[in-house]
UniProtKB/Swiss-Prot annotation:
Cysteine methyl ester: modified positions: C207
Chief location of this protein within or outside the cell: membrane
Lipid sites, type S-geranylgeranyl cysteine: C205, C207
Protein's UniProt name: Ras-related protein Rab7A
Sequence positions that bind GTP: 15-22, 63-67, 125-128
A cellular component annotation (GO) from this entry: plasma membrane
Role description: Protein transport. Probably involved in vesicular traffic.
PROSITE patterns according to UniProt: RAB (PS51419)
Domain of life: Eukaryota
GO biological process: protein transport
Subcellular location(s) of the protein: Cell membrane
PANTHER family according to UniProt: RAB FAMILY, RAS-RELATED PROTEIN RABG3C-RELATED
Single Gene Ontology MF annotation: GTPase activity
Length: 207
């Protein structure tokens, strides 16, 4: 079992298939990017340790397929999350329009104790594509959406060149830490359950 000084934080990344969820994870955790696209099957996760003030935290970052047939991963996947990261592609309007559906999906499945104040963070990814000339979702539009959802944090990112990825995940971690209950729990059951039930996955995604 983990030391009492170490806390597990479960982060869920949601968004349509192809928006770059896996690549954002890999850029943050491994500082790597692959141009080869392989869709995530089911769900997968990466971990990274962070220090905040005098405490150590392990971020367990979960990535989903983003496809309709995998949206039934269910309660075991969503429950126990400390922060939810909603992700879209700034060059694909449909991925932005899906954000409300993903947010509702999370709130229904995770059933947080205080849904009105549960921490979400929004990432607008792939700002590097074609030098930004192909984007169809403006920063203003994205920020207006965030404002309508309680002024949640927003970052424009590139998993390919790393723009704002570190900053975004530092914010995600901070929000997750602030959301943790006063009594520290290490969610050992969550780790075991995820490890024994999650589907096999293939994860190497374009940004």
């Amino acid at each position: 079992m983990a030391s009492r000084r170490r806390k597990l934080l479960k982060i869920i990344i949601l968004g349509d298939s192809g928006v770059g969820k896996t690549s954002l994870m890999n850029q943050f955790v491994n500082k790597k990017f692959s141009n080869q696209y392989k869709a995530t099957i089911g769900a997968d996760f990466l971990t990274k340790e962070l220090q905040f003030e005098d405490r150590l935290f392990t971020l367990q970052i979960w990535d989903t397929a983003g496809q309709e047939r995998f949206q039934s991963l269910g309660v075991a996947f969503y429950r126990g999350a400390d922060c939810c990261v909603l992700t879209y592609d700034v060059n694909v309007m449909k991925s932005f329009e899906s954000l409300n559906r993903w947010r509702e999906e999370f709130l229904i499945q995770a059933s947080p104790a205080d849904p009105d104040n549960f921490p979400f963070v929004l990432l607008g990814n792939k700002i590097d594509v074609d030098g930004g000339s192909g984007r169809v979702v403006s920063e203003k539009k994205a920020k207006a959406w965030c404002m309508s959802k309680g002024n949640i944090p927003y970052f424009e990112t590139s998993a390919k060149d790393g723009t704002n990825v570190e900053e975004a995940f530092q914010c995600i971690a901070k929000n997750a830490i602030q959301n943790e209950p006063e009594e520290e729990t290490y969610l050992p059951d969550t780790i075991d359950m995820a490890g024994s039930t999650r589907p096999q996955s293939s994860s190497a995604c374009e940004c």
